[in-house]
Amino acid sequence: MSSGASVSALQRLVEQLKLEAGVERIKVSQAAAELQQYCIQNACKDALLLGVPAGSNPFREPRSCALL
């Protein structure tokens, strides 16, 4: 029973390695350039860079009623 589980685990490992071997690889310099370009293009939509408008911030402290 243990050898059956071992064979099954090895078969899964072989399948995983086949999948990983089929992944297209690119150079780190190319990946870094693409990532940098992506960040520059999407900086205008990044809430961490621009901040969240006070009116639409779901994490702000709730205000108390001014009438009370």
Swiss-Prot record:
Its main location: membrane. The keyword Iron-sulfur does not apply. The modification Cysteine methyl ester is found at C65. Residues 66-68 form a propeptide. The modification N-acetylserine is found at S2. It is a lipid-anchor. A lipid is attached at C65 (S-geranylgeranyl cysteine). One of its GO terms (molecular function) is G-protein beta-subunit binding. The keyword Membrane applies. GO terms for biological process: G protein-coupled receptor signaling pathway. Guanine nucleotide-binding proteins (G proteins) are involved as a modulator or transducer in various transmembrane signaling systems. The beta and gamma chains are required for the GTPase activity, for replacement of GDP by GTP, and for G protein-effector interaction. Interacts with beta-1 and beta-2, but not with beta-3. Belongs to the G protein gamma family. This is Guanine nucleotide-binding protein G(I)/G(S)/G(O) subunit gamma-10. The gene is Gng10.
